[in-house]
Amino acid sequence: MNSKKERTRELILNKSYELFAKNGFKQITMKDVCEATGLSRGGLYSHFAGTDQIFETILEVINQKDEMNFEKEMNEGMSAIDILESALHLMEDEMLHPEDSLSLAMYEYAVAIDRDLMNDFNQIGEKKWTDLICYGIKRGEFNEVDVHEIVSVILYVYQGVRMWSRIVDMTDVTFRAITNHIRKQLIKESMRDDS
């Protein structure tokens, strides 16, 4: 069972995530976090020194999530197509819920506080996707693509749609078109469900 300190920290991160997703990074203060969590200022400050530290911790937790960490599945010999399908399903689900996106907050954080941290997270994402695509090519499941090119498309189109969908109505048809394009670029035609 988690200690009271761990549960309080988790409460802070969960409530802060909701605040950042709804309002961006710049508008959120420690007072807002206190109100959302019901903690006193002293209680909150005993866990985090400021909103930037809370936001950085949220990003680290997200980055460590197993859903987009392909290394375990690759080490277990899982099909590259199955790993890709799982990732694309998660991406579609996230695109369908722009209200849960931290894209605006990430942009504001990078401009106001630390662009280098965003670059670090981006490099981690590039490596994860590069490793998966190389794995799929090696296994003969993926086409021989320009890996850097397709990784750039995956990362930047996805993040662009997440940001854009905050201000423009988009449909699931658009989101499926994006993930279907990625499938068609990567998965060998003879191995696709639609062939």
For the regions a language model picked out, list residue spans one by one.
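Basic, helix-initiating cap at the start of DNA-binding domains
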Residues: M1-N23, Q27-L39, Q53
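Amphipathic alpha-helical segments used for helix-helix packing
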Residues: M95-D114
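Amphipathic, non-transmembrane alpha-helical scaffold segments
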Residues: K5, L13, L59, N63, ...
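Base-recognition residues in the alpha-helical recognition helix of bacterial helix-turn-helix
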Residues: A21, E35, Y45-A49, T57, ...
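Key DNA-contact positions within bacterial/archaeal DNA-binding proteins
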Residues: G42
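Amphipathic alpha-helical packing segments from all-alpha helical-bundle domains
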Residues: E67, L96, D114-R139, S152
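Hydrophobic/aromatic-rich alpha-helical bundle segments in the mid-to-C-terminal region
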Residues: N119, Q123, K138-R183, D193-S195
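Hydrophobic alpha-helical connector segments
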Residues: T57, V61, E71-P98, I150-I154, ...
